[in-house]
Amino acid sequence: MGVYDAIRKCVAFVGYPNERGFSAIGTGFFAYIQQGGLDFGYFITAAHLIRNKRPVSVRINKKDGLSETQETDTDKWIFHCTKNMDICAYPTTLNPRGDTEPHDVLYLTIESAALDGHELHESGLTIGDEVFISGLFASREGEKRNIPIIRTANIAAMPEEPLWPSPAVSYLIETRSLGGTSGSPVFFDLSRAGVTKKAEPPIIGLINQTGGSYPIMIMPYYFIGMILSSHAQRYEDDFFPDGPQADAEFNAGISVAMMAHDVLSFMNDDPNMRRYRDNIVEKKTRAIGHRPSTAVESSPDVRNGSSS
């Protein structure tokens, strides 16, 4: 199946600078949600990529054809309140002035793009259906900029029981390829199932272009989850080993994917995420004397982890 190229703009690579430029260990994606009418942007990825003693960096593509590597502040990462939920978020600056925004990114409008709950049931998504994954291929991350690839895959098992040690049920996806997908978003082309989720296409994201940011509708792609690992592995020790792992070393061809429901629940309802947003709104309100019309100016920038 053909895939609209803009979907690759929602991802960036997680890793470390090295003598060649950058060594990627996994993927993450940009998404934003609203709370109280305010926009909050995040970089979402798998927590096991971040839970180590060394601060990780994120390499983001730019409109000039190059990229920018930004070291993250370890203390700014927001982890799920349940330790074994393998997801975390880094607050970013969502710049509505696309003509001055150097980064070539697509922020997923996660709430309208997600296939969840009743709509997931109505979609008919089932074992054997084809899905696609946007993310890193570990053998070709790109020298000057990220080169995300699109992997086509198939649902090997629908979410039924938790896969130890995660407390949440997950998809098993036959990816037929090696590592690098941890933290990658997974999409389903609903048109191939012969059904339509809504009368109107979803606003799947906000894309920065010269002249400003604008909503982009990519019908009928829907977000169904996030890759946790590109292997099915029972860890005998701590679920989060001390340091990154090359999951290609014990790749089994089966990826474990967190459901969109759990990604949405983390972003909307997790106490750690809500506490962060509540603090931002409170500080902004005190500073200007009334409820702000946007939270963008207060959101930490992935470039330096600072807040205004």
What is the predicted function of each stretch?
Residues 11, 17-41:
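A conserved glycine-rich beta-strand in the N-terminal activation segment of trypsin-fold
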Residues 31-33, 158, 189, 229:
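Residue-level recognition of beta-strand microenvironments
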Residues 48:
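Histidine-centered active-site/metal-ligand motif
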Residues 4-6, 188-304:
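C-terminal subregion of chymotrypsin/trypsin-like serine protease catalytic domains
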Residues 8-11, 16-18, 25, 51-175, ...:
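Serine endopeptidase catalytic core focused on the charge-relay Asp
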Residues 45:
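Cytochrome P450 catalytic-core helices
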Residues 3, 33, 120-123:
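Short, surface-exposed secondary-structure edge patches
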Residues 176, 305-308:
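Bergerat-fold GHKL/Histidine-kinase-like ATPase
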